Amino acid sequence: HNIRWKDVENEPVFADVWPQFSPLFKGVDFVAAHNASFDRSVLSACLTAAGMPVADERFLCTVKLARKVWPGLVNHKLNTVSGHLGITLQHHHAGSDAEACARIAIEGLRLEPQFAALNVR
């Protein structure tokens, strides 16, 4: 994803920034992520490495949602689903990826509202 050590060597470590971000997760129904099992495992590993309790947030996987709602796509990668929905994406740029994921979740759940009840974990 083109992130090099020199890009981050002077940035704060996870343990220093998590307290600023963790309140954003409180009270939400779920966290949407494209390939949620990966994102959940990275978050858990970072929390464990920082000696912090593992988060219990519920995740909705937009890959699984996209497979359910748009089964005819050639694949269900973030850029493919985004293109299908007309979402502008700067692939592998965190803000753009997050916005695309949110838009996929919104549109997918609009079309399959029961998906969240059965698939948020």
Region annotations inferred by a language model:
Residues 1-56, 71-92:
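Conserved non-catalytic scaffold segment of RNase H-like nuclease domains
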